[in-house]
């Protein structure tokens, strides 16, 4: 009985000297009075109850009255039942301060983001991810982080900040397993090693099911799932998802409108490590309970700020519609980490100006650019590295043997890096065969499985080469200056091996 409701609740309904028999009688008496609705059963997380916020911490529920966080019943007069489960972090009496919120932003900014506001956007995502059940539309983030970027440290630090408020999985986890673990809750979900999706057809199907779950979670859509007992089961996902991988598996336009895609560059020297360590040390005093207390106190303010930011972002053609709404939630979350009030118009202008100059609008990427990115981020057959990484090995290998091994791998998929006659280091070219069978297999399950050569010809910097020898065979294909793909390869041409 205590798992259904607290002892105080039963006492309120049945009097001081109630017995189990009294409770059973009360339950029988309630039968038929209300129709069961899955939406009335809520798991752990933040929730909106009329205009109030409810935080179900599993073993207890909390709300805010007169500006203070207090404990409340898990059975509401509105008919909502907040399920009991494992205990999540309780909100602490003293919430996280503005300075501590800035420390989170500073730590995330210590990573080498390709995007101008990468650290700020990730910090805002974490804030809105905590309140995912309280808001109507949820953003998701996909971080592309190759080896040497500090991804392992990032994931570890995020887990420490969130405690068991977040659910953590690896790419090998099934959609059903994730769905069952989420249950009726609204916890933030971390999914690492999503590059496993590129290994085989079965893995790709598994990740596609996970992506379907993420799509439904964006707006909290209800799914009807069959069971062995032939009884349909309703499931409603209301979590925000953070996915991490080496490459990017976002293909559908529907997915790109729901995700903010961020990229981390490799570390550059000892100084970057020291900067990150210093920033990490400042997180030591931030507990999950302090972070949750701040988000509870500011959830309603965040919703107001999100609407204000969204209105301004919607004026920008590339950010209109759903994208403006999701970015509004994220930026409002980032603002709430360091400010407790309503955002001002000049502060919104600072955000929107940065959005206009950033590289967040993945939908503006052309089909040819997406095709090239798919090739560079795919894994070489028989090797754990991506095509882009093998190209880097060829250009920057520490030894002639390493560069020769890289050349053999590239030859096998019809790709060659060469310097035209009379050219200098900065004029190196990338040749991609339009006829290679292994490259065709890599692109088999994409939109370009039989036409990648024609598609790549549409790149502004590309030209067609009717004959190029690769591994003693003649090939037709596309030639692209290495300089034109350096943003995808993410390396400094000034350090190129001669």
PLM features: what roles do these ranges have?
Residues 182, 226-243:
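AAA+/SF3 P-loop NTPase mechanochemical coupling elements
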């Amino acid at each position: 009985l205590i798992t259904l409701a607290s002892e105080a609740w039963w006492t309120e309904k049945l009097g001081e000297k109630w017995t189990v028999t009294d409770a059973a009688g009360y339950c029988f008496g309630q039968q038929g009075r209300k129709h069961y609705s899955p939406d009335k059963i809520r798991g752990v997380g933040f929730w909106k109850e009329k205009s109030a916020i409810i935080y179900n911490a599993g073993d207890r529920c909390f709300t805010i009255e007169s500006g203070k966080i207090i404990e409340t019943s898990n059975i509401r007069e509105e008919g909502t039942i907040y399920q009991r489960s494992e205990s999540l972090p309780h909100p602490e009496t003293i919430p996280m301060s503005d300075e501590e919120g800035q420390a989170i932003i500073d730590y995330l900014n210590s990573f080498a983001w390709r995007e101008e506001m990468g650290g700020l956007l990730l910090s805002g995502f974490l804030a809105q991810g905590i309140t995912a059940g309280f808001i109507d539309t949820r953003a998701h983030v996909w971080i592309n982080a190759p080896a040497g970027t500090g991804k392992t440290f990032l994931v570890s630090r995020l887990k420490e900040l969130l405690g068991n408020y977040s659910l953590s999985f690896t790419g090998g986890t099934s959609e059903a397993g994730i769905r069952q673990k989420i249950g009726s809750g609204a916890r933030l979900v971390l999914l690492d090693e999503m590059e496993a999706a590129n290994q085989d057809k079965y893995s790709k199907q598994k990740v596609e099911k996970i992506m379907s779950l993420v799509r439904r979670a964006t707006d909290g859509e209800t799914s009807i799932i069959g069971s062995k007992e032939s009884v349909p089961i309703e499931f409603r996902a209301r979590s925000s998802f953070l996915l991490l991988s080496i490459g990017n598996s976002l293909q559908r336009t529907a997915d790109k409108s729901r995700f903010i895609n961020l990229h981390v560059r490799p570390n550059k020297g000892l100084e970057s490590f020291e900067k990150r360590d210093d920033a990490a040390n400042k997180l030591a005093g931030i507990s999950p309970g302090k972070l949750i207390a701040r988000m509870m106190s500011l959830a309603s303010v965040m919703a107001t700020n999100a609407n204000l930011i969204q209105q301004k972002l919607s004026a920008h053609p590339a950010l209109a519609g759903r994208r403006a709404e999701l970015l509004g939630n994220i930026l409002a979350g980032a603002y709430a980490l360091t400010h407790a009030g309503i955002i001002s118009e000049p502060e919104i202008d600072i955000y929107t100006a940065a959005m206009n100059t950033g590289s967040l609008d993945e939908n503006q990427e052309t089909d040819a650019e997406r095709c090239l990115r798919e090739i560079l981020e795919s894994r070489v057959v028989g090797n754990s590295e991506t095509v882009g990484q093998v190209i880097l090995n060829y250009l920057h290998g520490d030894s002639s043997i390493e560069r020769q091994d890289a050349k053999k791998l590239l030859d096998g998929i019809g790709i060659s890096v060469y310097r035209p006659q009379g050219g200098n280091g900065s004029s190196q070219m990338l040749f991609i065969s339009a006829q290679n069978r292994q490259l065709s297999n890599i692109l088999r399950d994409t939109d370009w499985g039989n036409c990648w050569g024609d598609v790549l010809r549409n790149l502004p910097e590309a030209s067609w080469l009717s004959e190029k020898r690769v591994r003693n065979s003649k090939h037709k294909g596309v030639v692209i200056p290495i300089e034109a793909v350096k943003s995808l390869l993410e390396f400094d041409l000034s350090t190129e091996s001669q």
